[in-house]
A protein has these predicted regions:
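Short, solvent-exposed interaction modules
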Residues: 36-83, 87-91, 97
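Short, charged, intrinsically disordered terminal tails
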Residues: 4, 93-100
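Acidic (E/D-rich), amphipathic helical modules within compact regulatory domains
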Residues: 2-42
């Protein structure tokens, strides 16, 4: 299982993330359809972006899945973050309480 705080990069674009909340599902974390790798791992020369998963990722945004896994994008890129073939959802910010 990937640990909290692990930094990963895409093999097909510039996307980089930090794992905020890890679950077993993150073992299949992908970007652009290809598995994400640690920052010190070489990118595969055979990795190609899946056009169906080329929606991009926004810097500074958190992405989550149904299992509770959460990643923070530290460098934006063209690939869509997914677990397997299922795209992650953008985490919505909680509204602040009124300060009357």
């Amino acid at each position: 299982m990937i640990k909290n705080g692990t930094r990963l990069k895409s093999q097909v674009c510039d996307t980089q993330v930090i794992v905020v909340r890890s679950t077993d599902a993150l073992d299949d974390l992908r970007c652009g359809g290809e598995p994400m790798v640690t920052l010190d791992t070489e990118k595969s020369p055979h990795a190609d972006m899946d056009p169906a998963l080329a929606g991009g990722s926004a810097m500074g945004k958190r992405y989550v899945d149904d299992s509770g896994a959460e990643v923070l994008v530290t460098k934006a890129g063209a690939g869509t973050l997914s677990i397997g073939g299922i795209p992650l959802s953008l985490k919505e910010a909680k509204p602040l309480p009124a300060s009357d």
